[in-house]
Amino acid sequence: MAPQFASSRATSLSVDRFSTASDRRHSSSSSTHQQRPQINERPITLWTHDPPNFSRNEVVLNPEYSLPRLAESDLLQLTLPAGSRLPHNSIPFGPKDRRCKFSTKATFVFRAAQATADADFVARQPQLQISVSKNIANNYGFYNRAEAILTRVTKDDFTIDHVELYFRDQYVGRAEMWRVFQNLEDTCVYCGQKVTLAGSVRATIGRIFIKEKKVTSGYVSASTKAIFRSESAKYNLFIQLSREMWEFDEDGEIYYEKALQGFIPELLRRWRAVPTNHILTVILFARVHYDESEIHMLEGPIRQDARGKYYIDYYKVVVDLESNCNWDAVMTTLKEEFFRFQHDILLIRRPISGPAASHEELHADLIRDRVHMAGRISSSYEGNLLEAINLALNPFDEHYIDRDLNRTGLSMVFLTAGTGHFDVDKKLLRITTERMIENGTGLDLVCLTKMPLHSVPLFHFKSHYPDPSELKQSQAAAHNRSQRRTGPGAGPGMTVHRPGQPALLSRHSSSRLAAVNSTPANPPDPLYFDSRKPVEEEDDFYSMPHWIDCSFYNLQQDKPFRADRFVPRCKMYDVQMMGFMENQISDIAIPYLDLKPVNKASSLHSSFYLPRHVGPSSSGFHSEPRNSEVSDLALVGLSPKQQRRIARERFDADVFRNVSPYLKPNPYRLLNAAAGTSGFIDSPVTSDMHRPGLRRNPSSGYGGIPTTNANSAASSISPGKAGASRPPVQQTRLSKLGREASLREDEADQDASAPPSPEKPRFNVLDEPLARPPLARPISHIVTSTTKPKSRAGSIRSVNTFSRGFMPMEPIGKAMAIVASTDALLSATSHTFDEQELDAAAAKQYNEADDSVSSLRSPAQLKAKGYSWLWKTLTGSTSSRSASSERSGDFDGGQGAKDFSTPATRSMQEVLSAQLRQQAGGSSKPTSPARRPPIPGRMSRTSSLLSVHEASSPAPIKIPAQQTPRSRQELETEAKLLRDQEAYEQQLEEEEARQRYAQRAQVEKQTLVNPSNPSKNLKGAATQLLRWQHLFPRRLNHHAVKWRSMTTPACLPLTTLYLPTESDLAAMWSEHPHTTSISAETASFLLKKSSSTHPALAVLREMAYHRLAQGYQFIVPASKQTRAVSSRKLVDPKHFTLRWPSELLQPGNLATGNPIFLSVTNQIHRISYDRSTSAINVKRYVRNTNYSTDPIDYECCIWPRHLPGYQTVKARFVYPDSASYNWTYLDSLIAGYVDEKFVESLRYWRTRFVLVPSEGSPPPMRAPTGEDLNDEEIRLIGTDKLAELFHRARFVRSKEEREQTHVQRFLPTSLDPAMSLQDDDFMKQLAEENAKQRAQSASSKKRLNKTISGRALEAVSRDMRSGGLVINDRIWHRMLYSDTFTGADMVSWMCIEYTDVRSREEAVDWGIRLMQDGLFEHVHKSHGFLDGHYFYRLKSEYAGTRGPKGWFRGTDSQRGSFAEKESLSRPLVHSSGQYAGSNTGETRGVSGGEVVSEKNAVAVAGTTSTSSRSSAGRHSRSSSLHLAHPPSLTMSSSHTAGGGGGKKKKKVQLSRSLVIDVDPGRRSDRAEVAFLHHDIAHNPANGFNFQIHWLSTSARFIEDAVQSWTRTLERYGLRLIEAPIGQIKDVSLHNPFQAPVQIELSLPPPSPATYRSKLPRGTLPELWFEYALLRRFGFVLDQEASARYPKDVEITYSSRPNTFEFSQFVHRSGVAFVQVLGGLDGFLWLNNRLYNSHTHALSQRHQHRDPRHAQQQQQQQQQGVVEAAEADKLRLELTRFCSDRDELERFYRRVLAQLLQVEKEESERDELAKEYARGIFQQAAGEDELSRRQAKSRQGSNSSSGTSADRPGALYALSQLSTGSERKSDA
């Protein structure tokens, strides 16, 4: 096939621009050009290969077959010709979890540099043209030897905008995410591609988007946004059991059935399809409201909301942190819970008098005489959603503690039967918003209903409007608090730039805006404002939190979705519940819609439809009935055509008279405010607050708002019937009968002389008031009078809403229900006029005023062509007077409204006169202090009107009977003067109105939202969305269920766009700068040295990585398409250029000086490098806080898993404290100015591990000398191996430093931690160990002068005695060995002492030679020289002389343990009741003085193993066995407990800390280091603790290191268990949904006084039986209670908590922890969630890595190992045993009997020790006699195995309690 040439236009034939395939196809083949065309496409033969067999690269291209003039940076596209692709169904797709839906047009894009990198492969296959991996071929339908088309494409067309990466079974930090993305930059990726980062992070490429379209491959540039999704997250599923959950949906399905049979199964199906490995928690929650009469029956945490309702919140945990739960059982439990939930929380059991009921009767499900139903489950709207969110966030506040290395992310899904609208507390909403945004956590809200017509999610709360004086005070207070902890400020002006600020809506809001001149430019968000005037009534606001993703799951099985199907949205539950035949015969009571009446303040029809010469009518002011004569007065003088037109318009207007004209959005409403219309922005109250003479109305529901009566009766008359006032909202839900009764009441108030009139229909053409539009009418009538009592104000209750954007703060939506105040306006008219005077004056006044006002126009009006009539109508001051009049009633709604009626004798002239006076007397808003005084007589003329407003008498005010009418000239003169003053005041206010508009319109846009018409350019919401904006590759479909978010939750994006302006930073943020100097010698353990990286660049990268790890985001440049307020608009190019971080972090770009910006909710960090000073400058901007950040205390009832019922839980919700992080110290630590030491304030990620003896026997092992080792010896070797692993992992800066240090071994001991501190020998060893570490450098210098080769034995012995080798008396299992040293110490000493000993292996060889030469010997002569805890001593000829040892110092101080008298399969138990080793039947010999042999039974399975080998007779050869006791144990237990007195406590450090390198293979480009804290002492029978703390190290390296240690230790019979750091008693403080299970004892243990004398002296008698019981079930000591330590010693641990209230045990399998309470309280049980959650993931991973792991796991199961799934079985078994009194009694008796045997054996051993010490026997004879007596005392116990003649029987006091045979007999 010949190459094809692309013929294109002349403008596209240059080398720099290549034509694509589509251009070639659409171009004309006949076009020509003088230049030679560029070849951009050619056919090519495609091969496939399987990496890494032929090549490690996925694409290999032969350059000879590529396109000409191909550059390495070019992009190539590989496609198959049409018709040659394999069928889609036959394409063997890859893994199901990343299957990509490739179409037939899918193309594969790759870089030329990627394809031509493997030259060796091309050289071996010269005929190769192009080859792709089989994975690519399968995904794209390619096949071997296929003919393909290779095309050159441009980067612009294939640059990826968003790419998704999926990962599972690993914890991926944000720093690792950024590094993964950096590795992908400047490469091409495809869907399904596997991505790795230095072998640590493994991810899979998911969806790829280019220009919001999904593609299969593309090019990753610096502007590409990466989306990281986790398939193994901590998943919380909350199900709200509100009242609606038991209701029926329209399709007849109950909502909880829809959840159980629809949503949850679908979610599980999608989980399995991925597949995911989430750790799941399922919680049911509800709120129950109680009446006040029911409070006395409740005992729970009763709370009261803002409305005074009493309630209790309930939570029940169904699934608790399970990774592989049985979903069949879970679904069954959920179904049962829906039936039992109400029963559990609504039925209250109460005691009654009479005899006690039987046990069965008390546990009956329903006892009519003993239970009472109380409370009602709340609706979803009133539920406890925010409380549940905060309870779930409490564990996440300390997410860095107990870090799960296999989980990433937190996902919360809330399932509700509501519509997404919730009534919440303001402070709780604020703290929830801050915590959600600070933690970078999202939430999915799934509603089972249809989507409502308003925006969701929607939170309704109450708040005060900011007061100007309070704003200034809060600003000052914020600056004073700038040095302290600062939260997300709501300072003035910060409403625009608050990321995380919800969009808000207010009703009744205009009255809360204070004077403009004293208010800051941008008042704070009401959500972030706390008023200091709590007496004021709060307004209603709405918030749309953008941290909630709302979905609607409303699938109907019988009605599949169709786009053309009508879906009803208004739910009428009574109608839905009707039967089919009930529609015509059933009555339904539907409340009336609360609408705002059409009055003169808001009427548009009265002005839109009237001609200019038509004056205002009085028809809106007289009461009903009215006669035709009065009705036709307004039509006098008009032509019949005009009369008919007005009549039609009256009718139309009457139809819509109840509907506010603001219901429809008006884009010019904003312009009206600029021209003087106040509306919500230009509130009359704002102006009137500055007006002298105004006084506050004390009876108003809104305490600080002047009560006004606007428009007199015109604005107060109820719609529908002009004479019938509308009652308050609480009284408006009347039937027709109620309305008629109200009408009759109105008629009764009329004058008796009024002629009767029939009832008028509702829609009468004569009902419409032809009044002058109120737009030009002044509002000076608001001025109140204090001379007369006021009438009752009208009532107002509304659900008013306000538009954002189109109508700033104007009432829309549901209108107000207004009830007029009595006597309005009637008394204002003191004169009567004739009709002609009224008509002329009214028309003239209307035209003049309207013209004067409409002439004041905004420049924006000029652009609105075709709307001049609308502008002219709306340019007056309507809105202000409308708002004023609408708010003139009683806001409490508690006062009734007296209906207003007009006396029948009132004439039309009087009514129109009143209207004219009202219009002329109060049109302007005098807010300026320099105001022209009112015209004389103006106030007097309107005094009657003003007095009406303040009148308190409910009776109508009578008009004076004798009043002389004034002349027409006087009337016109007065009207002209009033109009002149009106126009003058209007002009004065215009400038002020425009200024107000500029700020308040902006505020309204940014803080208020209309749920029914939300704005798309809300800045407050945009700044919050910017934190998550890069997570959305394209516009979301609000109708679709967000399954991807609920299946694979996304992590917080790494980049954001939000950056405040310079002025905002100066005004609303506090600055905290610091500088870090950089030099060429900069060195830190957090920096990896590299010759190619400048030190400043390395420090800068680490600073950025550590901030990313703490939740910060890079601030990146915004694209031109970004509409929101972003960094593109806020960066000043004069100072710097905001660039992509990946560009700035590259070599060569550091010297530009451009800063890197990183931000979190309340902080912004600006990091830049100053080349002139060689310093990195950091500026931290912390947002000021103007609101209270006090924590919120909360109480509720929670039913944790495995507990019998609800428990009262107290929780505290705390604001995030990101400002307290010590960034200055961290930056100094990165730069190397601070030593590497652990600092708690840096919030290290941390995890704890416990090393315990495993349940099975370790694999058989032989010493290098050939002898077999017993279980304890093997485990001691394992602990030494762990010390060696720690030594190898330590961080060293040089090779010499690594060679000079020696392995620091642990101090083995057979005592418990508390008892070891009373052992002088142990304390001496501890001091020597610390001294050895300090003197290590000095020993290294001495080493240079000595060699062991050719050195005489005498010289070596002198070196041993004086050269640093520890030779002293040692205790093991309560037996003293004098003048001994261990093999491990000997090896370490030789490595340090002699220069020719370079390794421990060489030291072992030299030790064997020295032992063979007779320098030293084993204490029992049973072992050769071994590197471990084996006791040796110099032979007598080399031992030298030592002073008296004081053998009698411990003769009577301590007794040994007792011998077990039963089977050999009993575990070894020491003086405190503990045993060492594992369950093996073999007899254990000495491991250098360890006179130990034991046999542990499997705790749960109860199996018994027999001994297969014997070490009998080892101790009979011992030559120097001294039975003595440590001097520190001479005091009694009472002494121990009371020691210390007033003495100063001695500090003892029982742990060691070091820095380890978890990347020994140097795979990472960073310094992967961590802090390791481990115990110093180790008892093989107890748990050994160590913790790992790290900052921004890749967690995968830490996990790999721990897993490597685990596999190594398993060969020595040891198990490494991941454990929680704190004690299990306090787990509820960290996670409120978790609680330990209490296991009580049915029979208390014997009193310590009964067995104290029989215990070995120095042994604590407390909890002896509890310890023995736990060890019987396979538990080992993890942490000992702090109270058991000596009082005169202050212990310090860095490897474990310093304080434990109760002793804590861990099971050998690692599945559970138990704390000992003591007495009848028994124990606390808690499953080990950390260990159990890893079982499934680790087993899958290790089976994949090493097939031997599966075989080993199978062997452990055959040996009876307890798996994680059996934790509950073990708990139930322990519970059964503790609840059986007979079993406990038998157990106690056996323990007491063994104590008697202990006392007998101890007396024999003490006597023998005394005789030997006195020198009665010779050494050999004494040893033989001792061996003989020991063998005799154990003959009974040896009968079962015959292998324990060498064991001191006193060491096995309670071993018989753990045998498998006894466990079976007990069962």
From Swiss-Prot:
Main subcellular location: membrane
Location in the cell: Vacuole membrane
InterPro entries: DEP_dom, DEPDC5_CTD, IML1, IML1_N, WH-like_DNA-bd_sf, WH_DNA-bd_sf
GO cellular component, one term: GATOR1 complex
Region (Disordered): 1-48, 469-532, 681-765, 878-969, 1459-1488, 1500-1551, 1736-1761, 1819-1867
GO biological process: intracellular signal transduction; negative regulation of TORC1 signaling; positive regulation of autophagy
Membrane topology of the entry: Peripheral membrane protein
Skewed-composition ranges (Polar residues): 1-14, 902-927, 1471-1482
Annotated keywords: Membrane, Vacuole
CDD domains in alphabetical order: DEP_DEPDC5-like (cd04449)
A GO term, aspect molecular function: GTPase activator activity
DEP domain segment(s): 1361-1436
Family: Belongs to the IML1 family.
The name this protein goes by in its record: Vacuolar membrane-associated protein IML1
